[in-house]
Design a protein with these regions (language model features):
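Nucleotide/pyrophosphate-binding catalytic subdomain
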Residues: 1-229
Length: 229
């Protein structure tokens, strides 16, 4: 769908790098996001958020520096950061007159029909009640080793969008566009304004992980777009 006005159900994915700063959570950004979601709801849109940030916020609360790569430490950071993340959402969205809900997922939920249908029914009921569902991977228990991890929330957002019949998937990032090469490394990088086909050379040019505490980047966003389309 290319006509935004016709989109009724919208999934918005927010990455770690847009939610956090070097000092901690970006509260101003979350308030701005809340205002924008409130506006979309006034237009009759249903909005579902897929939010990263738990590991990053947990790491900052523990005053960790650099990427958190140890699995046990990532799980600990997620357990610490998830309630901090939801507190920020509750506060900002509450000030904008909205109620939010937390939905934590593992890959198992979407891979089994019964649990998937239970999830879908829950989200449908939340939307019916006018609640904004905020979905995140349950990083405290999701691990690639036991096959319960999505890998990144870009992929999760695409899967959620397809499973709940969303009309539009928006992925927010701190990079202003897709480039033909990493603009943080190459000054001559040029923006790619429209992608008709997701090719291997394009994915390769998109680079790797986006932030120290996140798992996504432009590469995973292209892969997510491929899933969603």
């Amino acid at each position: 769908m290319r006509n935004f006005k016709q989109a009724k159900r919208i999934v918005i994915k927010i990455g770690t790098s847009t939610l956090t700063t070097t000092d901690g959570v970006n509260s101003a950004y979350i308030r701005t996001l809340a205002a924008q979601v409130a506006y979309l709801r006034q237009l009759g849109k249903q909005v579902i958020l897929v939010s990263s940030g738990a590991i990053g916020m947990g790491a900052k609360r523990l005053k960790l520096t650099g990427p958190v790569t140890d699995m046990k430490m990532r799980q600990a950071c997620a357990a610490i950061g998830q309630p901090l993340l939801m507190h920020e959402y509750h506060k900002a969205f509450g000030e904008a007159g909205m109620i939010v809900s937390q939905v934590l997922l593992t890959a198992e939920v979407l891979n089994h029909r019964k649990s998937y249908l239970n999830l879908r029914n829950a989200i449908e009921q939340l939307l019916h009640l006018g609640i904004v569902p905020i979905i995140n991977e349950n990083d405290c228990v999701s691990t690639a080793e036991i096959g319960t991890a999505f890998g990144d929330n870009d992929k999760l957002s695409a899967l959620v969008a397809s499973k709940i019949d969303a009309d539009l998937l928006i992925m927010l990032t701190d990079i202003d566009a897709l480039y033909d090469k990493d603009p943080r490394k190459y000054k001559e990088a040029k923006p790619v304004h429209f992608v008709e086909e997701i090719t291997e050379p394009l994915i390769k040019a998109a680079g790797g992980r986006g932030s120290a505490h996140g798992t996504g980047g432009m590469k995973t966003k292209l892969q997510a777009a491929s899933i969603a389309s």
